[in-house]
Amino acid sequence: MVAIPLRIMTADAHPVFREGLAAILSAQSDMALVAEATDGNQALSLFRKHRPDVMLLDIYLSGMSGLDVIAKIKNDFPNARFLVLTTHTGDAHVQRALKAGASGYLLKNTVRRYLLESIRAVHHGQRRIPSEVASNLVEYITAEALTAREIQVLGQVANGNANKIIADRLSISEDTVKAHMKNILSKLAANDRTHAVTIAIRRGILELDAVAS
């Protein structure tokens, strides 16, 4: 009896990377690539059409983020399996992906080493987080998380705004902004405002697109 191959779908903005994934998958007798999406909205639509066994996707997709794609699909298809493939190593990125419903999180530069085993494991209901990713989680596992308001304040700092402007934009007092900044520096073990922004971006607490907006 011939085994039915795993039906795989990919979602990534970069055509060269998608082509690489397609080449790897095509060499496997137990896997078949059924769809490729280039943005978040297309990913959602193609998933509903093809119902793949495992979806490989990046965090950052135009139109709708990869994490939103996962959350929306999980809402309608609780048993859907997702494996995130990305360049982002921050612990906050990983935590958000797992919370959204991803079962695995791989860095793109480790795909050749871990991809096939991870796909098979995720399909069987297991989680796959390689040591390169897990080490970041472990490093900050006891760190106190920033509150939503603290992230708002730090985002304003990242855009170069002074305390008075931040206070006006968030409808709070300058003293409150200063208190938030004191907490932020302490939680991130940062030396100053710039250092805090750098740490937050590296860890994925602040998103680059949000900083630029």
Report each predicted region and the residues it spans:
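Acidic catalytic/metal-coordinating carboxylates
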Residues: 39-42, 65-68
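Short hydrophobic/Thr-rich beta-strand motif most characteristic of the beta2 strand and flanking loop
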Residues: 30-38, 46, 190
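Recognition helix of helix-turn-helix DNA-binding domains
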Residues: 162-195
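Active-site residues of response regulator receiver
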Residues: 58-59, 86
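The feature encodes the CheY-like receiver
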Residues: 62
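Short, flexible helix-to-coil linker/hinge segments that flank and couple to helix-turn-helix
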Residues: 92-99, 103-152, 205-208
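Conserved acidic segment of CheY-like receiver
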Residues: 4-17, 21-25
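Basic, Lys/Arg-enriched C-terminal extension of HTH/homeodomain DNA-binding domains
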Residues: 186-213
